[in-house]
Amino acid sequence: MITGGAYQEKKKYAVNYYGISENDMKNGKNCSISDLGNAKCIYNFQYLTKKYSIDDIKKAIFENPDIIIISDIIGEGIIPIEKSERIWRENTGKLCCWIAEKSVSVTRVSCGIGQIIKTTPVVFIRHGKTTGNLEKRYIGRTDEDLCETGKNELMKINYPECNNIVSSPLKRCIQSAEIIYPDKKIIIDENLRETDFGIFEGKNYSELCKNPDYRNWIDGKSEIPNGEISENFKKRCCNAFYNVMKNAYRKTAFIVHGGVIMAVFEKYGFPKKSFYDYQVSNGRGFIADFDGKYLKIREKI
């Protein structure tokens, strides 16, 4: 959500920050409720409350959670004499408060400069250690349990409280989530599983160092034979993260794999860093803020 006074270049800010064009925008003065359900962006949003009920507008927004809403602040200044204008102000104010609560981010724009006044907190935690991790093996699709060392280490770390818990479908992540957040419902997302290491699966460096396919892979010259293509893996993880976050307005924890964390932060992390700059140890991770475009790390776990 983007808000601010009239004539403060809120549209221009949306174009520059979110990379949308003015052709992607609908004007609340003349658009329909169906436009709200499928547009990328609505500006002059405040005028919709003159034409449609709050319940109908909320329903349309739920059907289009990716929408960017631009609304003037209309509750300031002289109180209107006309009762209908006062009711319009009141209804618009209540609706905008509801949208702000549900939004991933809220930005107030003045003179074309945006001040982010709300982000969504998010926590990333890499699963605890498995036997394969202790032996420094490539463990991707292999569905290992946590080892006792991994379980004990998780119980010693002080993790932040979270409202929503999302986990990879693999046992090492689910078991980690159950230890870290024992009283929370765990949501399983199949698209947050680790990559498939193909012919390298279950092996370690000493077993692979003389393999020419392995040398080519670590040198960035080729993909893993019979494994998941790197770009496909990254895209899968980032899409899964975004699909969760566009509906998550409360603090959300992702209990996932090291590769998943690196993939998501490579795309959304700010300032920009490379994939391997976001490596974390087992049981460790990041506390960050997501504003719909960037993940900004607040602290390390």
Positions of predicted regions on the chain:
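Conserved nucleotide-sensing/catalytic segment adjacent to the nucleotide-binding pocket
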Residues: 24-26, 31-70
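Domain-level recognition of soluble alpha/beta enzyme cores
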Residues: 271-296
